[in-house]
Amino acid sequence: MAVALALAAAMQPAAAADDLKLGEALLTRNCGSCHAIGRSGDSPQKDAPAFRTLGSRYPIESLEEALGEGVMSGHPDMPEYKFDADDVGAIIAYLKSIQQR
């Protein structure tokens, strides 16, 4: 039992790193043409908020439902996005990791 717990604990950082990489890749592919995805830089579309500032607008966790059910925007230029549960978890983990403090 102790070996299994130690193995699971050792695997968590790798899984977390994989989630961060997946979240960043999903956001870059689906959102990067308009939004700044990383910890720095300007959004390609000046009116699109940088994702590192989303936490100042609302709790990042509040995006979970919208990402899973379909992100819809109030403007016609933004397409609707819908992600599966694993992708949502990765996106939320990545967004939390880049928030400005």
PLM region spans:
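Electrostatic cytochrome c docking/interface patches
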Residues: 9-26
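Localized chelating/binding microdomains
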Residues: 20, 28, 86, 98-99
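Residue-level signal for short amphipathic helical patches enriched in basic/charged
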Residues: 29, 54, 58, 73
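Axial heme c-ligation environment in periplasmic c-type cytochrome domains
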Residues: 45-53, 66-98
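Gly/Gly-Pro-rich "capping" loops immediately C-terminal to redox-active cysteine motifs
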Residues: 22-24, 38-68
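Bacterial N-terminal signal peptides
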Residues: 1-10
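The canonical Cys-X-X-Cys-His
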Residues: 23, 28-37, 91
